[in-house]
A protein has these predicted regions:
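N-terminal "arm"/small-domain region of PLP-dependent enzymes with the aminotransferase-like
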Residues: 1-27, 32, 228-230, 354
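Glycine-/small-residue-rich active-site loops that bind phosphorylated ligands and cofactors
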Residues: 11, 29, 81, 104-105, ...
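Phosphate-binding glycine-rich loop
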Residues: 27-74, 88-92, 98-100, 165
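PLP-dependent aminotransferase class I/II
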Residues: 35-39, 47-50, 111, 123-127, ...
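Structural detector of well-ordered beta-strand residues that form the stable sheet scaffold
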Residues: 51, 76, 97, 150-151, ...
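PLP-dependent aminotransferase-like
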Residues: 65-154, 161
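Conserved active-site segment immediately N-terminal to the catalytic lysine
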Residues: 152-186, 225-230, 278
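Active-site PLP attachment segment
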Residues: 169-213
Length: 377
C-alpha cells in the first residue's frame, strides 16, 4: 500500500548545517542571513531589491500598504486564487474587485480587467496560478493607460518566466511564498521584489514596526542610535534560521525545477490521452515551474471531482481541490451573486495531483494507473 502525500519539501544536510551555524552564532532573529538570502533571491529573479517577510500574505499586505492602497480604493483580483490574495486587500481597508479567469490557463482574464476598471481602481493584482505566469504585457498596457499599479501575487512562481524574464524581474512589485508546498521552503516565509529603492526601503521599515533603523544597523554602529517610528508598521520579519534554510534551498533550485518539469511531462503524456481529462496548457510566452500539477475533469468523466479524490485517497494517494473561488467562501458572502462562470467551473472540477522531487517513478505510475482504473469502474 502506497502512502503518497500531495507534496514533500526537499530538505537535507545542507539546510541542517546552515541552520546549526545560525544557532551557534547566537543571532537567530532577523540579521545577516536574511540580508544574504535577500541578495541571492534578488540576483536570481533579476530584481534590484528583495525584502523578506513572514509569508506571502504579509508580503502582499506590506506591498499594498506602502503603495498607498487604502479605504475607498479598488484592487482588481481573480477570484480563482488562494483566499490570501483578496484578504490582503481587505487588510488595507480597500475593496477587492473579482474578475474571471482564462479557462485555458486559470490566470486572470485580461479582457475582463479592462471592463472592470473604474475611477476607484488603484491596482491590478495578477496571480501566477500554480506557477504559470499570467500574461503580463497586456496587463501592463492596461495599467499604464489607467495609471494603475501592478502588484504580482507570485506566491507559486519562483523559477517561472514570462517572455524569457523570470517572474520578479519585470519591474513590478512581486510577492513570493516559501510555504512547504512551494518549490522552495523556509517553513513559512515570503519575499517581495521591487526595483524602486524608495519602495524597498519603506518595505523594510514596514516589516519592522515602521522603525527607522534595522537591528543590523544598530549592531554595526560605532555610536548609540536612538530609533524612531515615522510610520505605522508590523512585525513581519523573517528570522535568520528561516533565511539559512532558504539559502540552502536556493542552491538546489535548478534541480528542483528540472525534477518537477520531468514529472509534469510524464503526467502530460499519460493523462493527456484520457478523453475525460484536460491537462494544463502552457502558452508560448510562459515557462512553467510546475509548483502544482492540476487536471480538470470534463463533463464526460464517469466520476465527479470529489469522488475521484475520495477513491484516490482510499488507494493512499493524497490530492487537493484545484483552486478555490474566493467569492464563494462564507467570509465573502457579499460577493456571492457575481457571475464568474470559468472560475465556478474550474473550482468545482479541478484537482491537484502529487508532485515533488522525491516522488518515485513507481509512485507516479501508480497514481496514473489508479486514475485510469477508477475511470473504468
Amino acid at each position: 500500500m502506497f502512502n503518497i502525500p500531495i507534496t514533500k519539501p526537499d530538505l537535507g544536510e545542507e539546510e541542517k548545517q546552515l541552520i546549526s551555524q545560525v544557532i551557534e552564532s547566537g543571532w537567530v532573529s532577523q540579521g545577516p542571513k536574511v540580508a544574504e538570502f535577500e541578495e541571492i533571491f534578488a540576483r536570481y529573479v533579476g530584481a534590484r531589491h528583495a525584502v523578506a517577510t513572514t509569508s506571502c500574505t504579509t508580503a502582499l499586505h506590506a506591498a499594498l500598504s506602502v503603495s498607498g492602497i487604502g479605504p475607498g480604493d479598488e484592487v482588481i483580483v481573480p477570484s480563482l486564487s488562494f483566499i490570501a490574495t483578496a484578504n490582503s486587500v481587505l487588510y488595507c481597508g480597500a475593496t477587492p474587485v473579482f474578475v474571471d479567469v482564462d479557462p485555458e490557463t486559470c490566470n486572470i482574464d485580461v479582457q475582463k480587467i479592462e471592463e472592470t476598471v473604474t475611477r476607484k481602481t488603484r491596482a491590478i493584482m495578477p496571480v501566477h496560478q500554480m506557477g504559470l505566469p499570467a500574461d503580463l504585457d497586456p496587463i501592463k498596457k492596461i495599467a499604464e493607460k489607467n495609471k494603475l499599479l501592478i502588484i504580482e501575487d507570485a506566491a507559486c512562481a519562483i523559477g517561472s518566466a514570462y517572455e524569457n524574464t523570470k517572474i520578479g524581474g519585470h519591474g513590478n512589485i512581486a510577492c513570493f511564498s516559501f510555504h512547504p508546498r512551494k518549490i522552495i521552503t523556509t517553513g513559512e516565509g515570503g519575499m517581495i521584489t521591487a526595483d524602486d529603492p524608495t519602495i524597498a526601503e519603506r518595505l523594510r521599515r514596514f516589516r519592522h514596526h515602521g522603525m527607522s533603523v534595522s537591528d543590523i544597523e544598530r549592531h554595526m554602529a560605532n555610536s548609540v542610535i536612538i530609533e524612531t517610528y515615522p510610520e505605522l508598521g508590523y512585525n513581519y520579519r523573517m528570522t535568520d534560521m528561516q533565511a539559512a534554510m532558504g539559502i540552502g534551498q536556493m542552491k538546489k533550485l535548478s534541480f528542483l525545477l528540472d525534477a518537477r518539469k520531468q514529472m509534469a511531462r510524464m503526467y502530460d503524456n499519460e493523462l493527456g490521452k484520457i478523453p475525460h481529462i484536460r491537462i494544463p496548457q502552457v502558452p508560448s510566452y510562459a515557462r512553467h515551474n510546475y509548483q502544482s500539477y492540476w487536471i480538470e475533469l470534463l463533463a464526460s468523466a464517469p466520476v465527479d471531482r470529489n469522488t475521484l479524490m475520495a477513491k484516490l485517497l482510499e488507494k493512499g494517494i493524497a490530492t487537493r481541490r484545484g483552486i478555490m473561488a474566493i467569492h464563494r467562501e462564507l467570509c465573502y458572502q457579499a460577493y456571492a451573486g457575481i457571475y464568474l462562470p470559468n472560475t465556478d467551473r474550474l473550482t468545482d472540477n479541478t484537482l491537484l495531483l502529487p508532485l515533488y522531487p522525491a516522488l518515485s517513478a513507481e509512485e507516479q505510475t501508480f497514481i496514473i494507473n489508479s486514475i485510469k482504473e477508477i475511470f473504468k469502474q
